[in-house]
Amino acid sequence: MNSRFTSAFTPFAVSLGLLLVMTSAFPTPGPLGEDFKNDTTPGRLLLTTPEKTEALIKRMVDKISAMRKEICEKNDECESSKETLAENKLNLPKMEEKDGCFQSGFNQAICLIRTTAGLLEYQIYLDYLQNEYEGNQENVRDLRKNIRTLIQILKQKIADLITTPATNTDLLEKMQSSNEWVKNAKIILILRNLENFLQFSLRAIRMK
């Protein structure tokens, strides 16, 4: 990590009480495949570029759009009632002004940390998608795999200045519903928010 990142991370990590995890050995370098699917082994260093990482995010956004379209084709009132969707409060990870990812007040170091933390928090919602999504399950599997790859890439940039959040199994239980419309509304809301989250993260990735 260069001195520019070090100086930016240190005060932020201290202010938020982030724990620096010291690794006992350096990870083994490995290339990132053209489809970002060749190796997602934890702890293995992925050799990539900002352009490839940006391409990975854009592919995920396209995948999410395809999944939303698939749901909408089966539901006449798809995404037509924002009020009803808002009632399904899922406490989804979102970008805020303080996260440094917006054009106003942009801070690459802070944005990278928030993006990584948010994607880790999204894992429980991806569990819900895998359990409840009735469309092409290959899309869900690809999305999860690509997000794990992106998390690995981002962790390399922030030198493990973040810890993995505990799995909230209670939340997964609370999200269950026997009502088909409510279930689809939650899936749409998760996909829509994840798409927005990834879009905001692109600004930090594009910075060399």
UniProtKB/Swiss-Prot annotation:
Keywords for the protein's UniProt record, in alphabetical order: Acute phase, Cytokine, Disulfide bond, Glycoprotein, Growth factor, Phosphoprotein, Secreted, Signal
UniProt-recorded name of the protein: Interleukin-6
Assigned protein family: Belongs to the IL-6 superfamily.
Chief site of localization: secreted
Biological source species: Bos taurus
Subunit structure: Component of a hexamer of two molecules each of IL6, IL6R and IL6ST; first binds to IL6R to associate with the signaling subunit IL6ST. Interacts with IL6R (via the N-terminal ectodomain); this interaction may be affected by IL6R-binding with SORL1, hence decreasing IL6 cis signaling. Interacts with SORL1 (via the N-terminal ectodomain); this interaction leads to IL6 internalization and lysosomal degradation. May form a trimeric complex with the soluble SORL1 ectodomain and soluble IL6R receptor; this interaction might stabilize circulating IL6, hence promoting IL6 trans signaling.
Annotated Pfam families: IL6
InterPro entries attached to this UniProt entry: 4_helix_cytokine-like_core, IL-6-like, IL-6/GCSF/MGF, IL6/GCSF/MGF_CS
Compartments reported by the entry: Secreted
SS bond list: C72-C78, C101-C111
Entry-annotated residues carrying Phosphoserine: S81
A cellular-component GO term for this protein: interleukin-6 receptor complex
Function: Cytokine with a wide variety of biological functions in immunity, tissue regeneration, and metabolism. Binds to IL6R, then the complex associates to the signaling subunit IL6ST/gp130 to trigger the intracellular IL6-signaling pathway. The interaction with the membrane-bound IL6R and IL6ST stimulates 'classic signaling', whereas the binding of IL6 and soluble IL6R to IL6ST stimulates 'trans-signaling'. Alternatively, 'cluster signaling' occurs when membrane-bound IL6:IL6R complexes on transmitter cells activate IL6ST receptors on neighboring receiver cells.
Glycosylation site positions: N38
Record-level GO BP terms: acute-phase response; cell surface receptor signaling pathway via JAK-STAT; cellular response to hydrogen peroxide; cellular response to lipopolysaccharide; defense response to virus; glucose homeostasis; hepatic immune response; hepatocyte proliferation
GO function term, MF aspect, one: identical protein binding
Top-level taxon of origin: Eukaryota
Signal peptide, first to last residue: 1-29
